[in-house]
A protein has these predicted regions:
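A flexible loop/linker signature enriched in serine peptidases of the S9 family
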Residues: 21-26, 43-49, 61-70, 84-91, ...
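Short loop/turn segments that connect beta-strands within beta-propeller blades
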Residues: 34-37, 73-77, 129-133, 172-176, ...
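Hydrophobic beta-strand positions that form the internal "hydrophobic ladder"
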Residues: 60-61, 103, 153-156, 197-200, ...
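Positively charged n-region of N-terminal signal peptides that target proteins for export
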Residues: 1-4
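A short beta-strand motif characteristic of beta-propeller blades
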Residues: 38-43, 78-84, 134-139, 177-182, ...
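Bacterial N-terminal signal peptides
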Residues: 7-16
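Residue-level detector of Asp-centered blade-edge/turn motifs that repeat once per structural unit
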Residues: 56-57, 98-99, 151-152, 195-196, ...
Length: 308
């Protein structure tokens, strides 16, 4: 394993441990309305949780905390655990299928570890019914970190470490042979589909900084979209295909995406290329790792943090 890759793995591991062991943090599940600019707190807790998905019917969110997955009503209320069987080391890479029937997630498949003391290289992707159940394995190779469903629900995108490099892969949602979509040196991560399935948006270090890129669904014709002093992560196209929301660290982080940092959520207009800052907060890892738009595309969900 080369030195650069080892350093990246260590940074990811340390970031995870720092947050997982931080009891003095308040997590807030919020929504942001892109028309009014209003932030609304849906749920908050004096513990650490991450990565909201907004259900296709608009009635609930899925978050992760302490290795487990939870459902939170969209109108607020008490979180309820989603049964995942033996998969109890779930991380913040999870998402609901377009038809609302399945939940995909990544789980550290380490029988000797716990969520606070896990083996990074054991992450696999699984699915369960949206109501919970016995997990079905999707990826046999490790590590694999889920990121998106295709619009038709037939394919998944994920980031995987193969041949000492993190790249973006696609695989049938029911499992099968994985297809490598990127092969540039450095980290490629945070992939998500445009609603019509034509493009995949992702973040990449291939330019020397973490920027947002897009490519054809087959991995061809990569094109850089952002070029600024920030570290830009996790582009998520809106349901109407007009925008994508993404996270920007206000200070360059190299290829790391640590937690509890000053960040901005920004909106990229796909017609004009204009970028609008929506709001600033304390966050990063766990804020908007996975797709979180409302079904009507007027709002998206995120997690903001406050240390006490």
């Amino acid at each position: 394993m080369n030195k650069e890759l080892l350093c990246l793995l260590l940074m990811i591991w340390i970031s995870h441990l720092l947050v997982a062991q931080t009891s003095e943090v308040t997590s807030r599940l919020e929504t942001f309305n892109i028309e009014t600019g209003e932030r609304t707190i849906i749920y908050e807790e004096d513990t650490h949780f991450e990565a909201p998905n907004w259900s296709p019917d608009g009635t609930f969110f899925v978050i992760n905390s302490g290795g487990r997955l939870y459902r939170v009503p969209a109108k607020g209320g008490t979180k309820e655990i989603i049964e995942t069987g033996s998969a109890d080391n779930c991380n913040n890479d999870h998402g609901i299928s377009p038809d609302g029937q399945q939940l995909a997630f990544s789980h550290y498949d380490d029988p000797d570890g716990s969520y606070e003391d896990y083996r990074f290289e054991t992450s696999r992707i699984y699915t369960i019914p949206i109501t919970g159940g016995v997990p079905t394995e999707v990826t046999s190779e490790t590590p694999s970190f889920w990121h998106a469903w295709s619009p038709d629900g037939q394919t998944m995108l994920y980031t995987a470490l193969r041949d000492d490099n993190f790249d973006i892969y696609a695989i049938p949602a029911a499992g099968g042979k994985e297809q490598r979509l990127t092969d540039a040196p450095g980290l490629d991560d945070g992939s998500d589909f445009l609603p019509d399935g034509e493009y995949i948006y992702f973040n990449s270090m291939r330019s020397g900084r973490m920027e947002i890129w897009r490519m054809q669904a087959n991995g061809s014709q990569p094109e850089q979209l952002t070029d600024d002093a920030y570290s830009n992560w996790f582009p998520h196209p809106s349901p109407n295909g007009k925008y994508f929301v993404f996270l920007s660290y206000l200070q360059d982080q190299g290829d790391a995406h640590p937690a509890l940092k000053p960040v901005a959520l920004r909106l990229y207009d796909l017609a004009t290329g204009d970028i609008r800052e929506l709001t600033q907060l304390t966050g990063g890892q766990g804020t908007i790792n996975v797709p979180s738009w409302s079904p009507d595309g007027q709002q998206f969900a995120f997690v903001a943090y406050e240390t006490r």
